[in-house]
A protein has these predicted regions:
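Active-site neighborhoods of divalent-metal-dependent phosphate/nucleic-acid chemistry enzymes
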Residues: 68-127, 149
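Short, well-structured N-terminal submotif of metal-dependent ribonuclease cores
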Residues: 1-43, 49-61, 70, 85-90, ...
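Acidic, PIN/NYN-like endoribonuclease modules and their adjacent C-terminal/linker elements
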Residues: 1-5, 13, 21, 48, ...
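Short, charged/polar low-complexity linear motifs in solvent-exposed/disordered segments
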Residues: 34-35, 96-98, 130, 138-139
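Conserved beta-strand termini and adjacent loop/short-helix elements that scaffold enzyme active sites
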Residues: 44, 72-73, 143-145
Length: 154
């Protein structure tokens, strides 16, 4: 049986997690899975912009990672506004909403994040997906790196 590779959208927290003691083990396993070709990876222009002020070692991580760049569009901004209008999250989380909307509109299978407060949170995920369906978009799977890492059978 041939299984299609999952497409992953990595938000900024995943890239920063590579050097964070709390998240590095699972993040590094995920990056190894990506280097091994197990996923199709997408990074938005917004993520790249958010990394502008990051330490060089964090910015350089993307250089060695095969990925495709996608762009935040007006459609993404509009869907992000809908998440806020529907009170899935507050206005302070607009950037998080833009990440989710960008992944949704680009038909990415899974948005991967370490942000448990505003993104990887069952109540929030249900809210985002309710808004997606109400507006004619498909649902999106939202997971932490720990949940998408492929462990070798042993």
């Amino acid at each position: 049986m041939v299984i299609k590779k999952l497409s992953l959208y990595l938000d900024t927290s995943v890239i920063g997690g590579y050097f964070d003691k709390e998240f590095e083990q699972d993040t590094r396993l995920l990056f190894q899975n990506i280097k091994d070709g197990k996923y199709d990876v997408f990074i938005s222009d917004m993520t790249k912009n958010e990394l502008n002020d990051a330490p060089e070692k964090v910015k350089n991580l993307l250089d060695g990672l095969e990925h495709r760049k996608i762009f935040v569009t007006d459609e993404c901004e509009d869907l992000a506004e809908e998440y806020i209008n529907e009170k899935v999250v507050g206005m302070a989380s607009k950037e998080d909403c833009i990440h989710i909307a960008t992944a949704t509109i680009n038909n990415i299978d899974v948005l991967v994040s370490w942000n448990f407060k505003h993104i990887v949170n069952i109540q929030r995920i249900r809210g985002y997906n309710t808004v997606n369906m109400k507006n004619g978009y498909r649902t999106i799977d939202i997971r932490s790196p720990k949940e998408v890492v492929i462990y070798e059978l042993g």
